[in-house]
Amino acid sequence: QGHAFWGPAVFCLAAAAAVFCMVRDDPHALGLEPFGKEAQESAQTRALHALHPTRLRWAMVQLAVLLVSGIGATGFTHLMTLYMAEGMDAMRAAAAFSLCGLALMAGKFACGALCDRLGSYRSNYLLFGCFILGYVLCTLAPLRSAALMLASAVFLGFGSSLNTVGISIWAADLSTQERYESVLRQFQAAYGLGGLVMSFLPGAIADLTGSYAPAYALFAALLAFSLFTLQSTYRLARK
């Protein structure tokens, strides 16, 4: 089984070397021109960039980022534990975990494309819907249904793209070009803190209730709160 880790390790080393050689802060550093051309901002985008939320509203937005990132990381890593604790076969649970990873990869590709095509506001509903549905399906783990397990893995993985790609998109939407780096740093700090704060919850709740499923129910509710917070902030720009 140890040999299974060699492939990902070699791939990560090769990818890191490629990124180090090719990625620069400025395309001109490699004698290149930026791909494409600057798009015209819509009235909605200009209104978002001009938005100046109150301190309370901004604190709620950062809390939403913290929750999304912490729940995304914690729910993903505990998925296999959830189903094995409910008596699912280890190999089936491992297959579901792998499927979740593939769905996450697909979600990262789709997230940006959806935001470009539909806009961030509508894309948030779609991606959060998948995310929340995945966690709701996880609460049904005690039923020991292989079909529900695989479905939960797909929806949870696809929606988990929000806690990586989504954060940079929200930072771009809710800032100006001058403030983008500052806002992104704040969101990244919330991202890191979320992983620390939320990581202990599944185990603690399982100790109290005898199951990991209630933790996923709590996570679904917190994601719904995060969706409400972000979308209500976006709607401020529509007034």
Question: Which residues make up each language-model segment?
Answer:
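Intracellular juxtamembrane helix-capping segments at the cytosolic ends
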Residues: 162-175
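Helix-loop-helix hairpin linking two adjacent transmembrane segments in secondary transporters
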Residues: 1-28
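Helix-to-loop junctions at the C-terminal end of transmembrane segments
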Residues: 108-119, 206-207
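C-terminal ends and interior cores of transmembrane alpha-helices
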Residues: 130-143
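A late C-terminal transmembrane helix in Major Facilitator Superfamily
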Residues: 174-209
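Flexible cytoplasmic inter-helical loops of multi-pass small-molecule transporters
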Residues: 24-47, 239
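Cytoplasmic membrane-interface "Motif A"-like loop-to-helix N-cap segments
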Residues: 117-128
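Extracytoplasmic gate region of multi-pass secondary transporters
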Residues: 55-111, 198
